[in-house]
């Protein structure tokens, strides 16, 4: 075919079923959920990148007083890593049509994520008890802002997790929940990467 013909094609006007009943659709197809998650992750990446740039820029000022790092943050990081592993177990179970693998992975991922969020609240309480308020220092404000936004995204992930878990609990087949488990796992891994 000529280059001009290819460039002036309007695939949205072409009948998707061609000669002999063969479907003429693109070779690349993504479910709407995957497209939506990818667009959302791009937006979240931009937000976290801009905050990281602002954080790094603000660190250069003379009045920057860094906060101490409580040991609980390391425990929370471990909880988040193991939660991501549990979500991967659920995803592997979904890909292998193993409902017990999906169930075990989802249960552990949910429990560990709630433990992570509880640990974050505990860290905040520790910081406040030590006098590290958000309004006393820019470093403190950045700490609270970044951990709050990350925590809100984790809580939002728990909403999606709950939808997958409740569908599984009500007896949905692995095939019915496979996509939602895959999307949750991608989201969990992404938030773990942001946290690290």
What are these regions (language model features)?
Residues 1-196:
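...captures the hydrophobic TM-helix bundle architecture rather than a specific catalytic motif
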């Amino acid at each position: 075919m000529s280059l001009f013909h290819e460039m002036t094609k309007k695939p949205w006007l072409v009948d998707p079923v061609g000669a002999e009943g063969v479907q003429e659709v693109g070779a690349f197809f993504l479910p709407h959920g995957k497209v939506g998650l990818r667009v959302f992750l791009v937006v979240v990446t931009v937000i976290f990148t801009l905050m990281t740039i602002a954080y790094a820029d603000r660190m250069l000022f003379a009045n920057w007083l860094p906060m101490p790092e409580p040991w609980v943050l390391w425990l929370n990081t471990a909880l988040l890593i193991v939660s991501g592993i549990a979500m991967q177990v659920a995803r592997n179970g979904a890909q292998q049509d193993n409902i017990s693998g999906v169930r075990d992975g989802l249960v552990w991922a949910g429990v560990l994520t709630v433990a992570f969020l509880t640990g974050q609240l505990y860290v905040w309480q520790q910081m406040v008890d030590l006098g590290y308020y958000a309004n006393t220092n820019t470093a403190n404000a950045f700490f609270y802002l970044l951990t709050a936004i990350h925590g809100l995204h984790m809580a939002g992930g728990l909403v999606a997790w709950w939808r997958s878990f409740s569908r599984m609990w009500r007896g949905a087949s692995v095939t019915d929940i496979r996509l939602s488990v895959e999307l949750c796992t991608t989201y969990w891994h992404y938030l773990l990467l942001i946290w690290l």
